């Protein structure tokens, strides 16, 4: 792969800001991208439909009204197969990369060993995703094209929000497969993660959980998803940046063929819109802040 991104390729990142009436909320969508650059498809051993299994399919539609609620939205437009923005740059198993790169990766966790590191390399029932192990040029191209611009855009959005309001709330939105029996959190259809209190104060997590319960679905805290690289990196309650990860069961809005079910998606999108309004107003002292557009 070339080190430099071609100028004819579509944008990898989108930042959408509210047209009127802002709120101290930033929504991140790291896994909703559906663009597969030609370089990625050429390097793939797996088919595009197999690579699409990595996506948080159509989760961006859940956040379709986020800017109406006053939130800024930062979205990866390129697919997760390019790079996983919810992993750190060092999160890879040494065995998943070319020999000359192995020294820079160590102590991999369960997800990395399963091939779900910063560059996804394997999937269950598919096997290796790429024709050859990642070399230095391929890794650099992926990180420089998607991963680093995404986090730079997210940092900028949070800093601008905090500068305007004195604080910021990050909602990192994902979707998940149904949690199987025997796994922690089984039965929950919305999982709220704050890394067990590290990335958000209790009032925010309580507000998100209460809103999800009013929506009428089972909710879990931190089980089985406590929050990944995004909330761990950007959540700094002591500096005025609260961050929660929200995982939503895909069965709530997708058909079995993984296409959106508009009849079920609309109430979910409306719920998320209302949630953003609620947490904007729930911050202690928020009564003195400008209100988001209705």
Question: Model segments located where?
Answer:
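N-terminal catalytic or cofactor-binding beta/alpha core of small enzyme domains
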Residues: 2-170, 175-294
């Amino acid at each position: 792969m070339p080190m430099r991104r071609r100028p004819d390729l579509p944008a990898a990142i989108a930042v959408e800001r509210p047209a009127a009436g802002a709120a101290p909320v930033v929504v991140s969508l790291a896994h909703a991208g559906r663009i597969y650059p030609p370089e990625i498809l050429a390097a793939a051993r797996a088919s595009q439909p197999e690579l699409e299994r990595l996506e948080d399919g159509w989760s961006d539609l859940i956040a379709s009204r986020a800017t109406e609620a006053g939130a800024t939205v930062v979205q990866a437009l390129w697919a997760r197969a390019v790079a996983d923005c919810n992993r750190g740059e060092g999160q890879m198993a040494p065995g998943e990369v070319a020999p000359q790169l192995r020294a820079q990766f160590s102590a991999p966790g369960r997800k990395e060993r399963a091939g779900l590191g910063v560059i996804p390399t394997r999937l269950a029932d598919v096997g290796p995703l790429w024709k050859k192990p990642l070399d230095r040029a391929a890794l650099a191209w992926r990180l420089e094209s998607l991963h680093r611009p995404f986090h730079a855009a997210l940092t900028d959005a949070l800093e601008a929000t905090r500068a305007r309001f004195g604080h910021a709330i990050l909602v990192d939105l994902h979707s998940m497969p149904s949690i199987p029996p025997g796994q922690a959190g089984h039965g929950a259809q919305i999982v709220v993660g704050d890394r067990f209190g590290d990335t958000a104060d209790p009032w925010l997590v309580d507000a998100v959980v209460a809103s999800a319960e009013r929506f009428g679905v089972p909710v879990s805290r931190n089980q089985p998803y406590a929050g990944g690289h995004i909330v761990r990196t950007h959540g700094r309650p002591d500096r005025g940046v609260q961050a929660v990860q929200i995982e939503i069961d895909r069965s709530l809005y997708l058909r079995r063929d993984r296409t959106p079910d508009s009849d079920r998606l609309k109430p979910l999108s409306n719920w998320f819109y209302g949630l953003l309004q609620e947490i904007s107003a729930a911050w202690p002292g928020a009564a003195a802040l400008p209100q988001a557009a209705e």
